Regions:
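Serine-hydrolase-like catalytic core of hydrolytic proteins
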Residues: 1-164
Length: 166
């Protein structure tokens, strides 16, 4: 969602933008959840707050590259790539809501904080935000080996009755 503040102390100028990323360990949560507080933050800070949803759990993190080939090599990162796409949207659209595309801060709590750390390290996210507030969360997500990721994908595909390569 997009929430705009009151323009209280800023006159008619563009307001800073904030992009909120919810917590939930990458497994659950949503952009309008209690850890986002977009409306309260927008009015208290006179900023434009954008909260987003993104793919979670196996929809956002299941690696299918070994099962389906090169076309799926980024499949384990689709949830984070959704966040990059949302930042591109903010860059292209926040001005229509009174926000400044050159002054965007991203923030996240817990699992959302971990995603903020990830965005700080991603070349594809460079230039899409200007400051970051990772509130708790892992600096580095626990690593999963290619072998473990492939085993998890194989188990999920078997449960769904899907064969490799189909």
């Amino acid at each position: 969602g997009v929430e705009g503040g009151s323009r209280g102390g800023r006159g008619q100028g563009r307001r800073p933008g904030m992009g909120g990323c919810h917590g939930g360990a990458g497994e659950f949560g949503y952009g309008g959840g209690p850890d986002s507080e977009g409306i309260a933050l927008a009015h208290r800070g006179d900023v434009v707050v954008v909260t987003v949803n993104h793919r979670l759990s196996i929809c956002g993190h299941l690696y299918l590259g070994e099962a389906f080939g090169e076309e799926y090599t980024t499949s384990g990162n689709t949830g984070v790539l959704d966040l990059v796409a949302s930042l591109e949207w903010v860059r292209d659209n926040i001005e229509a809501f009174g926000g400044d595309p050159g002054n965007v801060t991203i923030f996240g709590l817990s699992g959302g904080g971990s995603k903020i750390w990830t965005l700080l390290a991603m070349p594809g996210a460079r230039g899409l935000f200007h400051r970051a507030i990772p509130i708790s969360g892992y600096l580095m997500w626990p690593r999963v080996s290619l072998e473990k990721a492939t085993c998890a994908a194989d188990a999920a595909l078997e449960e769904l009755g899907v064969q490799r390569g189909n």
